Amino acid sequence: MGKYMTNRKTALVTGASDGIGAEFSDILAGLDYNVILVARREDKLNELSDKLNNLYDVDCTVIPADLSEPQAAQKLFDLTQDKNLEVDLLINNAGLLHNGYFTDLDLAEQERMIAVNVLALTSITHLFANIMATRGKGCILNISSLAAWMAIPNQNVYAASKAYVLSFTQALADEMLANSSGVSVTALCPGYTATKMMDNPAQGAQLRIPPTMMMFVRE
């Protein structure tokens, strides 16, 4: 009998290949969750899957996906249904960040950032929130940012996308509560965190953030 036939709960984590997503996956596996790992890099996902299987003896499903692509959210949802995976906890962590003057940055890259940070998150939430509400239980955690609370020059599209995530999540949480759906919806707003997103000299270094202000994923 496979592990997915047990009473273990299952979490789906996007952006799971490194940083906050990988840390969430590790913590959840340690709490005896089976984990569905979603990100672009299949090799990194397989490495994480092997690690979690060895450490915690949980079942990991690897789903490589580029969430900036049209219909990526629907394809992800359909795969979970085809595999009979019941998602109890959804963590929308996948995100992109590009720094620089708005008019200097490539428009296609900014549109891709919106596709991942806003459109994919909205679509994935819609698909899984519906099925969770039908079951009468489930949890959704959307990763926003402290950037959601302010206008940030050189990060205007990123900050705006995270403001959307925060506002959307707060409103959806109220809807789910008012409808007695049994589904909890929460936004997490971390500060600047030492991940690969911030390691890129064109990203984190440009912000001139003192090392003492950086958070670490385990925090």
Placement of each model-derived feature along the sequence:
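Conserved glycine-rich cofactor-binding loop
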Residues: 17-18
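Conserved glycine-rich Rossmann-like NAD(P)H-binding loop of the short-chain dehydrogenase/reductase
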Residues: 31-48
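The beta1-alpha1 cofactor-binding region of Rossmann-like NAD(H)/NADP(H)-dependent oxidoreductases
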Residues: 42-43, 64-75, 107
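Substrate-binding pocket helix/loop in short-chain dehydrogenase/reductase
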Residues: 101-102, 109-112
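Active-site helix of classical SDR
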Residues: 125, 161
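Residue(s) in the substrate-gating loop at a strand-loop-helix junction
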Residues: 145
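SDR active-site lid
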Residues: 174-219
